[in-house]
Design a protein with these regions (language model features):
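Residue-identity detector for threonine
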Residues: 9-10, 21, 25, 77-81, ...
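Type IV pilin-like appendage domain
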Residues: 13, 17-73
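Membrane-proximal N-terminal amphipathic helix
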Residues: 1-10
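Low-complexity, S/T/G/P-rich flexible repeat/linker segments used as non-globular hinges
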Residues: 68-94
Length: 94
């Protein structure tokens, strides 16, 4: 995490994990979020115009939640289409 590069935000009203990075060609943002029945991923230039329906579908789902916890942990909770709740944590390096 480069000084706030990982955050929780909203994208068209959808809760999303946002990961920002600076490349030679500019600043880019990656969003992981739930929209219209799917967990989605969207990678865009920070100067682009985009919407939640622009993201690539990853897996079918019925709900998604993300939270940044202490000790550099991100908590993901995904409810699948069978209404089974799956929770996992991802650690990141500061």
């Amino acid at each position: 995490d480069n000084n706030g590069a990982i955050s929780v935000t909203t994208l068209d009203g959808c809760k999303a994990l946002k990961i920002s990075t600076e490349l030679e060609t500019g600043e880019y943002n990656m969003f992981i979020y739930y929209y219209d029945g799917y967990l989605r991923e969207l990678l865009v230039s920070s100067s682009s115009v985009y919407s939640a329906d622009s993201g690539q579908m990853i897996i079918p789902a019925s709900d998604f939640n993300v939270a940044i916890k202490k000790n550099n942990l991100i908590k993901f909770t995904i409810t699948d289409t069978n209404n089974d709740i799956n929770t996992f944590y991802v650690s990141y390096k500061s």
